Amino acid sequence: MSRRKAGRVPRRVDPDTDTDIEMPDLVMDVKPDLDLRSLAQGPWIARDMPISDVKRQLQTASRPLGAPSTCAPRMPLSSKSSDRQPWTDKHPDLLTCGRCGKIFPLGAIIAFMDHKKQGCQLLQVSDPISESKELKALSCLQCGRQYTSPWKLLCHAQWDHGLCIYQTQHLDTPEAPLLGLAEVAAAMSAVAVVAPVESKPPPVSSAARRSPTCDVCKKTLSSFSNLKVHMRSHTGERPYSCDQCSYACAQSSKLNRHKKTHRQLAPGSPSTSASSRGVSPAAPPEPAAYAAAPASTLPSQTVEKAGAAATAGVQEPGAPGSGAQGGPGFVGWGAPAKVERTDPVKIEKTAPRKSHGPGGKCEFCGKSFTNSSNLTVHRRSHTGERPYTCDQCPYACAQSSKLNRHRRTHGLGTGKTVKCPHCLVPFGLQATLDKHLRQKHPEMA
């Protein structure tokens, strides 16, 4: 309610007695009028011209399109490139420390935050931008190919140049000690880190981008991981071993399948019925325990007949055991004991015949088969039975087709063969012999 309606006399404000304390929020900023004469710098405007004439002259004056106005103040452009913000893709966004002036790229924001958390020490450190540009190139000393990651270079040195990075002998044998620092340094001598390369690497041809191929059997695989597993069939490497028996295999899935046999060895299990049919469910051959022995320690007849003191140990990928397994009666490679071999001509007669009757179900894993011969071969992966043996080396397998494929590595056909100078084992390819020398005779190579 106002003072008039309340019956009160409105308070009168005396401008002479009013002070700044009563009206503290009232601030008046009075600017002087713009002197248009100072803007009139053209020769067509006189200095002593009245202001009204100057306004009229400016309104009626016409200037060309795009010409700079004489009334607007012109700001000088900076000649320094650092004072101007670039807007091109060649100059990315940067993060600058306000204390030490260190520059970080926008992608290194984590490093910028760590730099601020450490108190921004005024030290001369390397520039992250220059470090990101100086990418080190990994190149092979033998062929000069460059790679972006150490793993790709290691795979290239292993498959293309035969660099052996795995231990092919069993760990329990005294002839297979762990590699020392000198051996590791000698093995990694083919890998080097070279200086940064200024120019771009040459484009990779289509032949270099082809799928990995096995040097032994010339089989092409889809990836290096599949090639790695496939090479174990030639080298005899069995990195997965059972902790309850001497079973060893090349794939982890086969080891998991083998462990199911130990769970079914209780009385009344299906394994007892398998043993009643003449199949040994839990009697896998002993793993690889042989070592390369000098030719002088072996009898001449044993060397001539066996002829595989340090064979490449070619094995099937799913065979339970290593490449030194020669089936029942195999004492050990390099031992003077006589090893009985199966005549390759009589393989078909001595090998068990395949029955093509109705199939059945596996007692170990429950897998069903429509053909009894396939069930018999599959059951051997659980029992470790390998009736097909090679007469040139301790290789043994569960299928005759795999034995025939293995025999090609020895070059037993009509083609030319090469023999190992130390153990007289024949090979059909020079690459197979070279791999055999590196793995079985490293001190003589």
From Swiss-Prot:
Q: Is Ion transport given among the entry's keywords?
A: no
Give the Basic and acidic residues compositional bias ranges.
338-351
An MF annotation (GO) of this entry: zinc ion binding
Which tissues does it occur in? Strongly expressed in testis and embryonic stem cells.
For this protein, the record's InterPro entries field holds:
Dev/Hematopoietic_TF, Znf_C2H2_sf, Znf_C2H2_type
Name of the protein in its database record? Zinc finger protein 296
Which PROSITE patterns does the record cross-reference, listed alphabetically?
Answer: ZINC_FINGER_C2H2_1, ZINC_FINGER_C2H2_2
Q: Where in the cell is it found?
A: Nucleus
Indicate, by first and last residue, each region the UniProt record lists as having compositional bias (Polar residues): 269-278
What does the annotation say about its assembly with partners? Answer: Interacts with KLF4.
